[in-house]
Design a protein with these regions (language model features):
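Glycine-rich ThDP/TPP pyrophosphate-binding loop and its adjacent helix/strand module
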Residues: 1-173
Length: 173
């Protein structure tokens, strides 16, 4: 979570030097409970710094469910406590993330200050190599894999070849 302090500091230095810069920082839902994250959000809000905070919310801080670690329903609610606007998207939907990030980046570049993007996603594997994931409930991973089987989406036409080609073109650019 310490990179948030760097992002705030970089945007403050850029402002001091007259440079038109923004910073984007990524962190997991577990890191969001570190004091430096909250301090950085407060600093960015007070000084209207163009910092974009992106939390990758997979529901677990290593092995602790967010139900036991976070008192709000959504991380954007926490950001709102600092006066920072935010949006939650399906972090597995490339186009949703791209669209939301584009709007937030535009806002930051226009002097709108900090913003918060919560990307909800699933962690299919453990937090570390060899993690037995005993903290997950019975059948939890099976239900998730059934619900988020991307090969079924491609086969069913929800994600079509043109979409995959468009993603490839964007990544190559």
């Amino acid at each position: 979570g310490t990179q948030m302090l760097h992002a705030a500091g970089l945007t403050m230095a850029a402002r001091y030097k007259g440079l038109d810069r923004i910073a984007c920082t990524f962190f997991g839902d577990g890191a969001s409970n570190q004091g430096t994250v909250l301090e950085s959000m407060n600093l960015a809000a007070v000084w209207n710094l163009p910092v974009i905070f992106v939390v990758e919310n997979n529901g677990y801080a290593e092995s602790t469910s967010i139900d036991y670690a976070v008192a709000v329903d959504s991380y954007i609610d926490r950001a709102a406590g600092f006066g920072i606007p935010g949006v939650t998207v399906d972090g597995t939907d490339f186009f949703a993330v791209h669209e939301a990030a584009g709007e937030i980046i535009k806002r930051a570049r226009e002097g709108g200050g900090p913003a918060f993007l919560e990307c909800k996603m699933v962690r299919f594997f453990g937090h570390f190599e060899g993690d037995p994931q005993r903290y997950r409930g019975p059948g939890e991973l099976d239900r998730i894999r059934e619900f988020r089987d991307f090969s079924k989406e491609v086969k069913s036409g929800d994600t079509v070849g043109a979409d995959i080609f468009q993603i490839g073109q964007f990544v190559d650019a």
